[in-house]
Amino acid sequence: MSTSPKKPKTKSAAYKKVDIVNVHLWGKHIGAVALDPTWGFYVFEYTPAFASLGIEPAPMQMPVLPGATYMFTDLPEATFKRLPAMLADTLPDDFGNALIDRYMAQKGLDKASVTALDRLAYMGNRAMGALEYKPTRSPPKQKPSAIVLSDLVTQARKAVEGTLDDDDHARAALRSILDVGTSAGGARAKAVIAWNPSTQEIRAGQLEAQDGFEHWLLKFDGMGSDNELGSRSDDGRIEYAYYLMAKDAGVSMSACRLLEENGRAHFMTQRFDRGPGNTRHHMQTLCAMNHLDYKKKGTNSYEQLFATLDRLALPYEQKEEAYRRMVFNVVGKNCDDHTKNISLRLRQGQRWELAPAYDISFAHNPKGEWTHQHLMSINGRFKDFTRSDLLQLANRFGIGTASAVIDQVVSSIAQWPTFAAQAGVKNDLADDIAGFHLLTLGRWGAGALAASPGRVRWRHTSR
């Protein structure tokens, strides 16, 4: 009996380290970034050709000036990776970085030897927003094919738990999750997908979407527990209920929906950094735009947000929109209101604008490190706000409709049971969340805001 010879295992190609990364925006080479060996930080310079176009991708901290170089030795490394903030902003956070580390390990690089330039090169043209990086060190493109969501959930959970093995099947699983999971920010496991609303088919969405497909972001349900987040089984439904409630309150958001499979409810939101025909929009979080480190607790304020909007000369309507979101976060107890959860958008040929709201959900843990109080202050307070606090901020920044905005938001959040029922949130959980809503902000009760006593359940759903 003859046997076929075993197919030899193929070694992955050796990884080539990156010394300089060229940055592109809308097909134009805008500059390059490299390590300054003296300081140990990364320095960026715009190209002379780009400097003549009048486009400002980072107007507050890196204005486009011929011959100017930018290096920021005062920015905390944990957040900005020794990079200029505009570039660091395009790197993924915990989940995406863990996947990149796993991929690099297969290439023979341990985590300590992977530089910020390596990570930018890995992102290539996969990053959120419109910036692209060359050379590219990411896996080669694959032909778009359908993804089985339940399999992807399993792979994401293994990636979160660090239990992906090194056999051939594990490598294939890693490749699948890499195709969807290394672009989006935030600690929670997310997938960047292309979704066909007619056929319900899902494909990897980091590159161009095919005809009939749209760019969406999916937050995985069923990922287990987290020290800060606690039980995670209802996060998708809660966030969807908050989306319905925010829309009713007049908050501007991209389309959202639930994708249900095998008893799980995954929250989906349409990407606002993509437009028709795979158009890409340039993005900056508030964290990057104004160097407001989102990891610094007890430091940042909503006043800094409105000062940023004023410096960018945004119109009144967008300042009112930002105010509406602030009030919604306070009344709805979304304490995960850090500077990476607010973004500005630049569409090609247009001016900077406030991006749609995102990561709007119930997020409060009285014993949590991050969400026992708000992460941005109002009138010097991080909790126990009064209507007067909100109105004083409004007066300072010329929000003349503030009182009406507050009352509209309170009226919508008072209808929480209706929105929770529409999203399928369990009654007892919906009741617990309602106990934390700060409805005393309404015109009929403008006293100090405090959570209802006796509530012991907590949730934190957006980090």
Please give the residue ranges for each predicted region.
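Phosphate/dinucleotide-binding and metal-coordinating scaffold of catalytic cores
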Residues: 1-339, 343-463
